Amino acid sequence: MMDCRDASACQGVGSLCFFPYLNPLVSWHALVLGHLLYLFVVFVMRSIMRGRRALNMSRVLVVYNVLQICLSAAMAINLSPPLKNGVFNLSGKFCPDIEFWMFVHYCSKYIDMLDTVFILCKKKEDQLSFLHVYHHCTIGLIWGILLRNGLANGTAFFGTWINSSVHFLMYSHYLWTSLGYRNPFKFLLTKIQMLQFSLCILHAILVTLLDTQFTLGWNLLQLLYNASLLVLFLNFYMNSRGKGCAIEKKPQ
């Protein structure tokens, strides 16, 4: 990795460290308006679709799932080099390629909001859970805040890498089932998601104890956010056990 820096050179600058020209895309206006717009679209589309028939989104979803698989694979692969410094890359250098792909990951969270649009178009109201909306209207906000503070780097890569890897598995499943096939490993996917959040909680604890690059406030944000997702997914998993195995949030 070229032109890597110590974390101190990036922290507190109030900007992306290596790509400051991208700052407008993580400004407070962009973050707040982008996520408020998501909630507005959810409200409006629910009203519009209430008196309409469900739309056939089969072909659109095949294309969408293929694109999501490719994007997730690209992010997971390009964010994997820091793994050679240990799973969590504790006290790792801040490098431009990590920041770039973490920015791509942040942008992908807006693309992921199309999951909700497809759910509403198909009138799958049972999939529009609190967990679904909560996740989509917070995850991009958190990554954007890290980016705008120059902290989307170093050991922070882990959250984006594991999320991209899990999304690769998830969208592969949705593509497979959208083509009419059955996935015998479906029951594992919610467990893999919960493992992801558990590892992110462990990551936050280890960063607090062993890494001096991030303050306690940032570590608590990661810990509490992933703990909230773990609790919500666990509740979803327990409720779905009696109904057969289910997977949260994506339209098929």
From Swiss-Prot:
Motif HxxHH motif location, chain numbering: 132-136
Q: What is its main location?
A: membrane
| Source superkingdom | Eukaryota
**UniProt entry tagged with the keyword Flavoprotein:** no
Which pathway does this chain act in? Lipid metabolism; fatty acid biosynthesis
Effect of gene knockout: Genetic disruption in bloodstream form parasites reduces elongation of arachidonoyl-CoA.
The record's subcellular location field reads: Membrane
Q: What class of enzyme is it?
A: transferase
Transmembrane ranges, per UniProt, are 25-45, 60-80, 100-120, 127-147, 150-170, 187-207, 214-234
Q: Which InterPro entries match?
A: ELO_CS, ELO_fam
Please give a single GO biological process term from the UniProt record: fatty acid elongation, polyunsaturated fatty acid
Q: How does it sit in the membrane?
A: Multi-pass membrane protein
Tell me which residues are glycosylated: 56, 89
Q: Which taxonomic lineage is given here?
A: Eukaryota, Discoba, Euglenozoa, Kinetoplastea, Metakinetoplastina
Keyword Ligase appears in the UniProt entry: no
Q: Which UniProt keywords apply?
A: Fatty acid biosynthesis, Fatty acid metabolism, Glycoprotein, Lipid biosynthesis, Lipid metabolism, Membrane, Transferase, Transmembrane, Transmembrane helix
Stated family: Belongs to the ELO family.
Q: What does this protein do?
A: Involved in the synthesis of fatty acids. Elongates arachidonate and other C20 polyunsaturated fatty acids (PUFAs) with a preference for n-6 PUFAs. Not involved in fatty acid synthesis up to C18.
Active site per UniProt = 135 (nucleophile)
- One Gene Ontology term, aspect cellular component: endoplasmic reticulum membrane
Q: What is this protein called?
A: Fatty acid elongase 4
Gene Ontology molecular function terms on file? fatty acid elongase activity
Q: Which reaction does it catalyse?
A: (5Z,8Z,11Z,14Z)-eicosatetraenoyl-CoA + malonyl-CoA + H(+) = (7Z,10Z,13Z,16Z)-3-oxodocosatetraenoyl-CoA + CO2 + CoA
Which Pfam families does this entry report, sorted A to Z?
A: ELO
